[in-house]
Regions:
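Right-hand nucleic-acid polymerase module
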Residues: 1-2, 344, 362-424
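A conserved non-catalytic segment of reverse transcriptases
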Residues: 312-374, 382-385
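Extended C-terminal regions of large enzymes
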Residues: 406-409, 414-462
Length: 462
């Protein structure tokens, strides 16, 4: 065995199970996280130094580490999908089952089971397929993701913001502001749309370019799925629903920023430094590209992007990939971004407003007979989430409009409940004067300690 690999196998973070407490509840999670982070830091260092054999050795060490396996099991049993079984209908819901699961996470003899195919409704009413792995396969993906993520984060495009630690949608929107707010900023935007990105990524490209255990990756890609008790093969794509899938998709699209930068470098024209102002901002498979003129976007950049995608088995949607002027505005990540003079204003898209109100009306309609307190709690959860996402935009008009539509929907809800009562009675029954607002939708309720309190509907504008 290679001496370097022997050295890695002696790493303290690869402690054997018989040296640790066999009780799940007594695992030292702080120590486990420190050990894994130490190995991940070494992977990052080796990747930056171009020592690819060292990277592989460290990845092997990490994926065979007890602590990493324990953290993988903890992740898949602690998140929201921890009670969602795969085709084997197995869940790990006891400390004993979780401890036994750690011992099952072995490379030798590993064969993933087919995914359980389900469909969820998208905002446009269409169905999105999800592939749900078994608990064991999820844990194996979480384990190998710990070894892959240090590499993916080191090599990622700097302006990629989706499915990455300590990055979010707001970072991508802020980057759009940074690019477009200056007086000499680019004025033309290519709004990119990839046809079924997750569903069509080339398996051959992934196997040739993703720096992880190829045998394990091939098994995941080719495991197939079960739908309506029938088995189907998977010949392309990385299924939405797998823990490692977002990282694989990100790594597939990484490199586009460099391809654009290499093609459109700053250069001198007639003794002056010239920049074509080509910038990329990407969140997962949603991206925009800026440029100083429409022709370059249409005739050069769009074909370049199409070729980049084609190499990876992907295609741009001709209908949805459009070029717009920043003064006319463009939609990105649920925001409409538009330049007014020197100011960049962001607000919720009309599509987002419509979808939100459809959701609100659905909740109200489905709860015609529930108590006011219960309805307020359900609505507040949705209002808080939607309002929180858009709180930093130029949302005053949008929020006023939404508040008014919610009021109208609730007024109809109240009228249906008391069809024989007058408007004044209905108003006094459900709306109250609170902090100077006479039309506050509110309900009194009793706390566990017996004291009375008042629950009010959240307002986006207050």
């Amino acid at each position: 065995m290679n001496d370097k690999i022997k050295e890695n196998l002696l790493d303290q973070s690869c402690a054997p199970t018989d040296n640790l407490q066999s009780n799940w509840d007594r695992i030292d999670w702080t120590k486990a996280e420190q050990a894994v982070k130490k190995l991940q830091a070494r992977i990052v260092k080796a990747q930056k130094e171009g020592r690819h054999n060292k990277v592989k050795a460290l990845q092997w060490t990490l994926t065979h580490s007890f602590y990493a396996k324990a953290l993988a099991v903890k992740r898949v049993t602690s998140n929201g999908g921890g009670c969602t079984p795969g085709v084997d209908k197995e869940i790990w819901d006891t400390p004993k089952a979780k401890m036994q699961a750690i011992t099952q996470l072995k490379r030798r003899g590993y064969q993933p089971m087919p995914l359980r195919r389900v469909h969820i409704k998208k905002s446009n009413g269409k169905l999105r397929p999800l592939g749900i792995p078994t608990m064991k396969d999820r844990a194996m993906q979480a384990l190998y993701l710990m070894a892959l993520e240090p590499v993916s984060e080191t090599t990622a495009d700097t302006r990629s913001y989706g499915f990455r630690k300590e990055r979010c949608c707001m970072d991508a929107i802020q980057q759009c502001h940074n690019i477009l707010r200056k007086g000499y900023s680019p004025e033309w935007i290519l709004e990119g749309d990839i046809k079924g990105c997750f569903d069509h990524i080339s398996h051959e490209w992934l196997l040739a370019n993703i720096p992880m255990d190829k045998a394990i990756l091939r098994k995941w890609l080719k495991c197939g799925y079960v739908f309506n008790k029938q088995m189907f093969p998977t010949e392309e794509g990385t299924p939405q629903g797998g823990i490692i899938s977002p990282t694989l998709a990100n790594m597939t699209l990484d490199g586009l920023q460099k391809a654009l930068a290499d093609r459109y470098k700053r250069h001198h024209v007639n003794g002056k430094l010239y920049s074509p102002m080509v910038n990329l901002v990407r969140y997962a498979d949603d991206f925009i590209i800026t440029c100083e003129n429409k022709e370059t976007l249409e005739n050069e950049i769009k074909p370049l992007v199409a070729e980049f995608m084609s190499e990876r088995g992907l295609t741009l949607s001709e209908e949805k990939t459009v070029i717009t002027n920043v003064h006319d505005g463009f939609d990105f990540l649920g925001f409409n971004i538009r330049k007014y003079g020197k100011d960049i204003l962001t607000k919720p898209t009309k599509k987002s407003e419509k979808r939100f109100m459809e959701n609100i009306r659905k909740v109200i309609k489905e709860n015609k007979g529930c108590r006011q307190e219960s309805l307020i709690r359900m609505l507040n959860s949705k209002i808080r989430g939607w309002g929180g996402y858009y709180q930093h935009g130029a949302t005053r008009d949008s929020f006023h409009r939404i508040d008014h539509q919610i009021f109208l929907s609730l007024w109809q809800w109240a009228k249906r409940r008391h069809s024989k009562k007058g408007k004044r009675w209905i108003k006094d029954r459900y709306w109250h004067d609170i902090r100077g607002n006479k039309w506050t939708f509110a309900s009194k309720f009793k706390k566990p300690n017996g004291k009375e309190d008042q629950l009010t509907l959240l307002s986006l504008t207050s």
